[in-house]
Amino acid sequence: MAKKVTAYIKLQVKAGSANPSPPVGPALGQHGVNIMEFCKAFNARTEKLEKGSPTPVVITVYSDRSFTFETKTPPAAFLLKKAAGIQSGSAKPNKDKVGKVTVAQLQEIAKTKEPDMTGADLDAKVRCIAGSARSMGLVVED
């Protein structure tokens, strides 16, 4: 018989640096999950990723307090900021432009995000990433 799922926990944790401090500790502790076991497993799974990149993770907690987790790709905003070489997006994206990205960079980001995105083909995913870039105040160049 399959184990009963008691909770799904969604977090964003920096790759390779999960520790029991907030937000990880309290989120897992209230569901009775072994926090250190998760931290060790998460850090081992994300050691190949760029250290410090925010990594979304979905943790499935079962009735016997065991867990499984699935890591996702970093957020598009993080990848766009890295590609444009900026610290943060524009507060007024319609008026103030803070950087530029090329279509080639957008295609690279879309390929990275492909497992987590919905869309008919790569071109549709590139358009989605381009929309995120424009909403951050980035100019998309050909």
UniProtKB/Swiss-Prot annotation:
This is Large ribosomal subunit protein uL11. One of its GO terms (biological process) is translation. The gene is rplK. SMART domains: RL11. Forms part of the ribosomal stalk which helps the ribosome interact with GTP-bound translation factors. PANTHER family: 60S RIBOSOMAL PROTEIN L12, LARGE RIBOSOMAL SUBUNIT PROTEIN UL11M. Pfam families: Ribosomal_L11, Ribosomal_L11_N. NCBIfam families: L11_bact. GO terms for cellular component: cytosolic large ribosomal subunit. GO terms for molecular function: large ribosomal subunit rRNA binding; structural constituent of ribosome. Keywords: Methylation, Ribonucleoprotein, Ribosomal protein, RNA-binding, rRNA-binding. Part of the ribosomal stalk of the 50S ribosomal subunit. Interacts with L10 and the large rRNA to form the base of the stalk. L10 forms an elongated spine to which L12 dimers bind in a sequential fashion forming a multimeric L10(L12)X complex. It comes from Aeromonas hydrophila subsp. hydrophila (strain ATCC 7966 / DSM 30187 / BCRC 13018 / CCUG 14551 / JCM 1027 / KCTC 2358 / NCIMB 9240 / NCTC 8049). One or more lysine residues are methylated. Belongs to the universal ribosomal protein uL11 family.
